Amino acid sequence: MRPVAKADVGGSLGLTPWQVLHAVARGYVLAGQGMGRGLAEHWLSLKYCEALHGNRAGAMDLTDKGRTAERWYKSMQARELAVGFGLAAAEHIVRKRYPDHIVSVVDTSTILRAGWALGGAQRDKGSRPRPDFLIEAWKPGEPSKVTFVVCRGNHQKPSKRSGRTRSTTIQQLVKGAELAEGMQIGEWNSTPCLMLSTELMGQGGVVVNALQAPGEVRLPLRIPGAPGNADVEIDGKSGIPYPNAIRIPAREGRRARNVDGFQVGENDLAWFGQLLARTGAAGLTAFAGGGQNTAQYLTKHQGREHYDVPTFAATSSSHDAEIAVGGRKFVGTDHVFRMETVRIEAFSGMDADLYGLISEGHVEEYRRAAYELRSTLPSAEESRKWSGPISFHEDGTVMALSILPVRRRNAL
C-alpha cells in the first residue's frame, strides 16, 4: 500500500453537498436487492440534506444539525456519508487515470451473489471479506478496467497539539486493505485497490484519507452484436469455490499457497465482464424507477424476484416522473418529504434517450450513446435555472431537489 500520488488527484476535489448525496444514492441503489418496497434504497441519502455545508474556509463540513451526539446516528452517518465522500474521491482518481473513460460504480455484494456464497456455513464467523464497491472505467471499443474500493468513515478529531489524526483512520485503512485482499480478478495481486477513510470532523472540515495498491485489470473486449455482449442474458454460476480459491505465488522466500477468497478465474473473465455491465445497468434502471426494467438484468441470486413484480407509486419506486433541464429531458422517479415546514420533492432519473435504450435491454448501445453525450450535460449556468440543488453524472443519471408550493387543504 502507498498514499495516492498528487498526480492521481490533480489538485483539490470540488464537490457540493448534493453531489455527495448523489454518490451515496448511487452506491446504495442495489444494496438491499430491491427489498425496501416502501421506499427505494437510494432515498436513504435524503436524511443528510441538512448535514453538510461549506465552512468559512470553503471546505465541506458538518452543519450544527449534522454534529449530533447520538451514538447510533453517528455510526450510521459515518458509514453512509463515507460512501458518498469515498466514492466521489475514488471516481475522481479513476477518471484521472483513465481520462477518456466513463466510470460506473457497482456494489460488490450484488455482483458476487451471481456466483458465490457471501457467508460461510458457520454464521458466527460473519460475512466473507471483500471490497465494498467495484469501479469500472469503460470506453466503447476498449477493454474495461476494474478498481476495488473500500469506504470507511469516522468522527475522530485531530490532535490539538499536532493536528495529526488518531488511530481510527489508520485502523480503517488497514482493515480496508484486508477486505480488498479477499477478492482477486485474474492473476493474484493485479487488481488496483483504493482504501478510503473519511474524517467527518477532520481538521478544517471533512477530510478523505486515501491509500492505494497499484495494478491494472483489463476485462476481455466485448463486440456489440456478437456472442458474449452485455445485451445477452446470462445465468449465475452459483457454487464457485471460496475455500482455498486464491493462489498466492511463491515470493520473498515463502512457498506458494492457497487462501480463502473470491477468485474470478481467467476462464471467467468474459462472463464477469458481462455480469459487471449488466449489474451496472440494473443499478441505473433502479435509480430511475426499478421494476421489471431492473429485473431483466439480474440473476435469481442477485434478487431478480424482488423487482420482477408490478410497481405502484404508493408501494415502490416507479419510473413515472420527468423533468427538463438545459433542453434535455430526464425520466425517473420522485419522492416527497418535509424539511421542517417546507415540502420538498426529490427526483432521481436518467436522460430520457439513454433510459429508453437501457430499459429495452440495449446495454452496448446505451454505452455508445452515453459516451457520445457525456460532454453535453447541462452546464452550470443551465443548472442554476433549476429551482434547487441538482447533480448530473456522466453515466446519464441526475438527482435533484425542488421546493413544492404550499398546499392548503379545504375544510371538509
Please place each PLM-identified region on the residue numbering.
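Nuclease-adjacent, charged terminal/linker segments that flank catalytic cores
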Residues: 1-57, 282, 286-412
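Glycine-rich, often proline-containing surface loops adjacent to acidic residues and nearby aromatics
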Residues: 61-70, 144-152
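Acidic-basic catalytic patches of nuclease active cores, encompassing PD-(D/E)XK
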Residues: 68-119, 180-192, 284-285
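Acidic, metal/cofactor-coordinating or nucleic-acid-engaging core segments within structured domains
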Residues: 95-98, 157-360
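Extended hydrophobic secondary-structure segments that form protein cores and membrane-embedded regions
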Residues: 105-112, 147-151, 193-201
